[in-house]
Amino acid sequence: FWALSGGWRISNETFLRDVRWVNDLKVRLGYGVTGNNGFGNGYTTRMYKANDMWPTNGIWQPGYGSVRNVNPDLKWEEKSELNFGLDFSLFDDRLWGKFDIYHRKVDDMLYEVNAPMPPMVHDTVMKNIGSLENKGWEFELGGDIVRSKNFRYTSSLRLSHNKSKIKRLGDDGYFLDQVTFPSPGNPGTAVRLQNDVEIGQFFVYKYA
């Protein structure tokens, strides 16, 4: 995995040195790829434990059993991110802030999905199942409301906007249930992961 970033402190340039109200002005640009192997032991190599009960010829017998289903084809989840930022400090450092725009993409997402029994021993298995896109912006603005020799009072404001969307998740029409209704009677799930659908959207019945 690798990353590359750079910055330009514009306030050090000759065309801004005489602009007294600009104390600091900098732009940043970065791109990098990181990995996540967020799964524990036993997902790629079979592990066993004792004192389990397993059906044999219709009778439950004590013995050794597999801890979980294994997937020898598991690989790192990869996240790539492009980020552009602006930092500034103005009016004798009384007003400061920063602004960031980012675009992230996660490929080979790790997720535990349902598995058929048999041939699997357990009902779930960890897989690399798809890709996720995440983009948005963040803005922070702060300043000195009061500044004196013995007292200083500051305030800040933070704003952000983010969109996350599943770009690929198996075949068209495939989805994964996420959040179940708490009502009695098993009414089903309210949130799901699905191709080209923003994360967090509700899937419910429409009533007139």
Where are these regions (language model features)?
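Short, intrinsically disordered, charge-balanced linker/junction segments flanking boundaries
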Residues: 201-208
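Extracellular/periplasmic, surface-exposed regions of secreted and cell-surface proteins
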Residues: 1-197
